[in-house]
Amino acid sequence: MTEYIIETKDLTKRFGKDVAVNSVNMKIERGQIYGLLGRNGAGKTTTMCMLLNLSKPSSGEINLFGEDYRKHPKENYSKIGSIIETPGFYENLNAVENLKIIAKLRGNYNRKTIDEVLNLVCLYDAKYKKFKDFSLGMKQRLGIAAAIMHSPELLIL
């Protein structure tokens, strides 16, 4: 039997009378790349927020790594890296300082790892530049660095 990294059954999200996500069923296998496509307002971001436990489903099931996401939320979500539409970096801190905060919150601060991910996303030479002075592309790459810094099993972009 295949163990899915993500599996949803009839995942639904309502905001009052409005249905933002209606009975989404998906099965995502480990090592695969999937895309969630749709028009504006189709519920893509809402679905991602439910998968990341940032928003609770109105009904339906979410299984992560083969079990109900509510059973071991801290354990399961430590295996996930994500990039949300507006990353929450501190404007007056540089790239290293911002990543250091994230690493410490996750309990895995390692300066060498920070340097490695900054190099990987081509921000090593800008590591002491303040976030507010980054271009949009640099901000997005810092978001990628933050998402991959702890070597997640699942990356949601």
Report the location of each language-model feature.
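Walker A (P-loop) phosphate-binding loop of ABC-type ATPase nucleotide-binding domains
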Residues: 39-43
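Conserved ABC transporter NBD signature motif
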Residues: 60-71, 75-76
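Conserved ABC ATPase "signature" region
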Residues: 100, 104, 111-126
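Hydrophobic anchor residue at the start of the ABC signature
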Residues: 144
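Catalytic Walker B motif of ABC-type/P-loop ATPase nucleotide-binding domains
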Residues: 155-157
